[in-house]
Amino acid sequence: MAYRKRGAKRENLPQQNERLQEKEIENNTDVTMENKNNNRKQQLSDKVLSQKEEIITDVQDDIKIADEVKKSSKEESKQLLEILKTKEDHQKEVQYEILQKTIPTFEPKESILKKIEDIRPEQAKKQMKLFRIFEPRQLPIYRANGEKELRNRWYWKLKKDTLPDGDYDVREYFLNLYDQILIEMPDYLLLKDMAVENKNSRDAGKVVDSETASICDAIFQDEETEGVIRRFIADMRQQVQADRNIVNYPSILHPIDHAFNEYFLNHQLVEPLNNEIIFNYIPERIRNDVNYILNMDMNLPSTARYIRPNLLQDRLNLHDNFESLWDTITTSNYILARSVVPDLKEKELVSTEAQIQKMSQDLQLEALTIQSETQFLAGINSQAANDCFKTLIAAMLSQRTMSLDFVTTNYMSLISGMWLLTVIPNDMFLRESLVACELAIINTIVYPAFGMQRMHYRNGDPQTPFQIAEQQIQNFQVANWLHFINNNRFRQVVIDGVLNQTLNDNIRNGQVINQLMEALMQLSRQQFPTMPVDYKRSIQRGILLLSNRLGQLVDLTRLLSYNYETLMACITMNMQHVQTLTTEKLQLTSVTSLCMLIGNTTVIPSPQTLFHYYNVNVNFHSNYNERINDAVAIITAANRLNLYQKKMKSIVEDFLKRLQIFDVPRVPDDQMYRLRDRLRLLPVERRRLDIFNLILMNMEQIERASDKIAQGVIIAYRDMQLERDEMYGFVNITRSLDGYQQINLEELMRTGDYGQITNMLLNNQPVALVGALPFVTDSSVISLIAKLDATVFAQIVKLRKVDTLKPILYKINSDSNDFYLVANYDWIPTSTTKVYKQVPQPFDFRASMHMLTSNLTFTVYSDLLSFVSADTVEPINAIAFDNMRIMNEL
């Protein structure tokens, strides 16, 4: 009863922090054991004294203790299990957090699989509007006396005017514009998709897009528009040449916009699609595999098009010196591969109960005399067998390093490990793990069989235990088997331009299992002279269990090889082999499960699974290459624009983000900079280079169309009169710098030498500071007088900061508040500054009207394999590369 009181009080204690909760979970195990003892004592006292149970109430805390406190031993054990499970889950969460912190690019598996499957050809690039930087805008015209005229004039202005001030920032703006164009650059343009009706047309004609239609509408309604232009707009319509599948649409575009769109139209990525292309798109080994029956739909329209995937190989060599990046790529490939490896379901495996019963009979475990032999049956289940099968194939497909987990005293695990090391190349295992497993096999099975002393292996020895043992063992069959394992490596073969890691032919056809069995038989016949009889008997029975399944092991090896090679045909990136930062754990008990439970049912990937795996690989690979092209282009553009402050690391970060699978903040800096250096060495792709040259040639025109910045300022010691300008009225503006001494503002900021400006001004010589400056307008004459002189020159000379330079544009015209004050009193305002602003390009309808040509219609297919219907032969009849059934043991 005392226990109950204590328990009740403990439950009512306030939980001050999370640490107390953790301590409670850990202490619960001890408390539960105490519960057992107390309950037993309670039962005894109840039997002796009374059958009634008292309910003790703690008056002070008002806590009621329920009748059900007395629990059965079954309930207690259940509670104990729950506590232990909670503790185990908590430890897993802690390990998960540690993993997240230590592995730079670690992410949960489900999210990685979703990310890699969601990478698809970018259908968003199907344009519904033409690409435009400029739009025409109406501006008033001012007479010589500053009064506004009734007529207007059209100029080309920026659609989105976000130009910053400062030459460097302007160049950075152009880099961002370039990046935006690269993202928006269409793979193909079909003008018919974006064409809209021309409202002013006589016969329901169409123009190329909605913006062209709205411009035509505005010009048509403008009173200043000439009659001939109105008649022309009324006649604007598409011209169709159906026999050539061509259509021409009228468009109104700035010459620079026209150059971009014309380039996009002439350099589309779509190519004609026919049955031969689809046939060649299917991996050759799948086409030639007699287990798959493929049929193709022959009814492809002549207008069918496709975008060829960009499958260039190894341009960055991410396997070389990019440990965390490579780890993430192999992890995502592993997770993807696991999702496509066929499952060994329970109906394909031998019944676990029946098999364990048979093994028990073989081991003669009725007496259960030897503890070690009971371990042979531990952990054998169909789930572990399936997990092992998927892990082995997925790890080889993704070239993920595996680490082995085993107990040395479980001889059955070690004997299963001998099969594993025989069929899986050594490269696939973590070196330390491989050495530990080999050493356990040598010291537990091989050396004791021949009465040899234990091998004392020196850590760091270049030779593995099996390599040392091969030289010391005299028995031919065992030495021959060791020799095979020591030389079991992947063969690198280039198939269809892709580097494949292929298995040894002896493994593919399963003959190596006979070699393994010969070695095992030799070992079981040995006397184990230095070991007790029970030890010898345990090893022999373990070998007997495996050798009884010789036929199934041959079939399993052939099945493993076939599934690996069939799925490998769907891989498009070179299979580079490098040990990975993290490993996939493999329990040797699960290998035992696979060896003991494999049945005679053949499982091969379904055609739909293969096509899905192939499509995901193609999409990821193509996206990877396109993002490389973007990053290389941006790095080259940043260098050519002389963006010396641009952090190249940010470009590399954007590149990795666009690959979808990386957790960019966790990638170490050294790998970021190494990646930058690799990207710098690559050439720029042709389309991207041409687009950049178009921007480079027209930077001045784009800058000129902005209302946010001026191109410089002229500073004088004496006042200068305001001049008449058709666009603004009377202004302190100049359209030319001829006759002025010019100083570059960016150079001035970098050197900080203001002496030259001061000397020139003191000598009464005006000086022109050239650079992108904020274009501030102020039309109030009163504020103009207040800010005069002190605005520009005094501040920059005093503070030595050019970035504070904000020359004000003084506009005096009939729109300004004080225009009549100036006009009536013949006041001629002056200023010590003149803003240098280039004239935007006037809108000329005739020069802006362009005919754009594209195909009248075509259909772009992104999934070529949707045309292929596929089926498989009956799995029992499926044959391997040697024209024999994959699984012969029926």
UniProtKB/Swiss-Prot annotation:
Key words of the record: Capsid protein, Inner capsid protein, Repeat, RNA-binding, T=2 icosahedral capsid protein, Ubl conjugation, Virion
Gene Ontology MF terms in the entry: RNA binding
Site (Interaction with the intermediate capsid protein VP6): F232, M236, M849, M851
CC terms in the record's Gene Ontology section: T=2 icosahedral viral capsid; viral inner capsid; viral nucleocapsid
Processing after translation: Sumoylated with SUMO1 and SUMO2. Sumoylation of viral proteins seems to have a positive role on viral replication.
5-fold hub: region residues: 1-88
Domain of life: Viruses
Positions of the UniProt region annotated as Disordered: 1-46
Quaternary structure and partners: Homodecamer; each decamer is made up of two conformers of VP2, called VP2A and VP2B. Interacts with a VP1-VP3 complex. Interacts with the intermediate capsid protein VP6. Interacts with NSP5. Interacts (via N-terminus) with NSP2.
Role: Inner capsid protein that self-assembles to form an icosahedral capsid with a T=2 symmetry, which consists of 120 copies of VP2, with channels at each of its five-fold vertices. This capsid constitutes the innermost concentric layer of the viral mature particle. It encapsidates the polymerase VP1, the capping enzyme VP3 and the genomic dsRNA, thereby defining the core.
Family indicated by similarity: Belongs to the rotavirus VP2 family.
Domain notes: The N-terminus binds RNA. It is necessary for encapsidation of VP1 and VP3. The N-termini of 10 VP2 molecules form a cylindrical hub underneath each 5-fold axis of the inner capsid.
Protein name in UniProt: Inner capsid protein VP2
Annotated source species: Rotavirus A (strain RVA/Human/United Kingdom/ST3/1975/G4P2A[6])
Phylogenetic lineage: Viruses, Riboviria, Orthornavirae, Duplornaviricota, Resentoviricetes
